[in-house]
């Protein structure tokens, strides 16, 4: 379960996230959102799907029209740094949302409900399924510096705003 705090408090923002990996690389993924009964799936090289509908990221090309998702750490020191990052980013984007489940947010980028998602301090199991689904839907994925993704820094977005987000984060 991703979004365990939401689950414990009976909030709808949680997901069941499963990935099959070879080494650290996800090759098949499924994310189920119980609140909406939506099932997102992907297989490496075969695309991403919501039910029978193929997924594509949004066509957003400007930060000022971008809806961005993020999450917050349980560490107060890390949350303070995250708050500073968000205060710098807020004037540049349409708005920022926090769902509480990284797997769901990654799927929301994949289907175009969000234009980007960033977070720090995730665990590999938070990331594996949603990362593959977003990638197969055409998302660009990196850390905050534009380098290969790690669970400690995750940036997933439409290709049209990725470099602007790297510069802003």
Feature locations, PLM:
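Glycine/serine-rich anion-binding loops at beta->alpha junctions
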Residues: 1-14
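Acidic beta-strand-loop-alpha-helix segment within the catalytic core
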Residues: 17-106, 153-169
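Glycine/threonine-rich flexible loop motifs
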Residues: 9, 78-79, 120
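Oxyanion/phosphate-interacting regions
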Residues: 84-91, 104-169
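Buried hydrophobic packing segments
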Residues: 16, 20, 130-133
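Conserved G/P- and acidic residue-centered "switch" motifs that form tight phosphate/ATP-binding loops
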Residues: 4, 33, 134
């Amino acid at each position: 379960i991703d979004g365990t705090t939401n689950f414990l408090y009976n909030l709808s923002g949680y997901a069941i996230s499963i990935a099959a990996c070879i080494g650290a690389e996800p090759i098949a993924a499924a994310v189920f959102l119980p609140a909406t009964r939506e099932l997102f799936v992907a297989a490496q090289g075969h695309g991403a799907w919501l039910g029978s509908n193929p997924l594509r990221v949004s066509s957003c090309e400007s930060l000022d029209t971008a809806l961005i998702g993020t999450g917050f750490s349980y560490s107060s020191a890390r949350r303070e740094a995250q708050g500073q990052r968000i205060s710098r980013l807020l004037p540049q984007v349409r708005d920022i949302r926090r769902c509480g489940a990284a797997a769901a947010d990654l799927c929301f980028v994949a289907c175009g409900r969000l234009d980007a998602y960033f977070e720090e301090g995730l665990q590999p199991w938070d990331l594996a399924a949603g990362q593959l689904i977003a990638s197969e839907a055409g998302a660009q994925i990196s850390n905050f510096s534009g380098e290969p993704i790690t669970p400690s820094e995750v940036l997933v977005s439409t290709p049209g705003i990725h470099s602007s987000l790297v510069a802003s984060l």
